[in-house]
Design a protein with these regions (language model features):
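Carboxylate-rich, polar loop motifs that coordinate divalent cations or form catalytic acidic clusters
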Residues: 1-167
Length: 167
């Protein structure tokens, strides 16, 4: 069945039937203000409700875990972006940097901006977009400080736009 799970900042989760183009609600409710959603390699559904941390659900919507600043080491409850890399969930937050969650242990690691440190420091702590490419590099789009390439041994920030010429 060709169905796409989508999220909307104001309409919550939606299932889009790619054959008919019709949307319907999933059989479970996660609220209306959903910032991001990810289905990982284990078919778990990760849902980021606005200012609600991160929820992990089974494919049929049963709640497996909830991570917030109150019950875990998540650095910020406003989760803007999600990606998976080698079984870990990368979590871009609005002001809390990038949290890396091992779903098996519940342990968080943190990548953040450290003032005065260029090595292994993010240029900013608000991460709008995360993407894991085919070479297993994470690309992070910050809100005001450029595009960040995160590799196993290095990090590079791109802030300058290439010059454009009029045709």
């Amino acid at each position: 069945k060709r169905t796409l799970l989508c999220c909307s900042r104001w309409q919550g989760l939606l299932l889009l039937d790619l054959n008919t183009g019709k949307c319907r609600r999933p059989p479970f409710d996660c609220g209306k203000e959903i910032m991001n959603v990810l289905i990982d390699s284990q078919k778990r559904i990760w849902v980021a409700p606005y200012n609600g941390g991160l929820n992990c659900l089974t494919h049929d919507g049963k709640l497996l875990a909830t991570y917030t600043t109150h019950n875990s080491s998540l650095s910020n409850n406003v989760v803007l972006s999600l990606a998976e890399r080698e079984g870990e969930i990368w979590i871009g937050t609005d002001g809390g940097g990038i949290n890396i969650l091992d779903p098996e242990t519940g342990h968080f690691s943190l990548l953040e901006h450290v003032p005065g440190s260029d090595n292994y420091s993010l240029p900013a702590n608000s991460i709008l977009c995360l993407y894991n490419d085919y070479n297993n590099n994470i690309w992070a789009g910050s809100i005001r400080n450029g595009l960040i390439s995160i590799r196993e041994v290095s990090m590079k920030t791109y802030t300058d736009l290439p010059a454009t010429t009029a045709d």
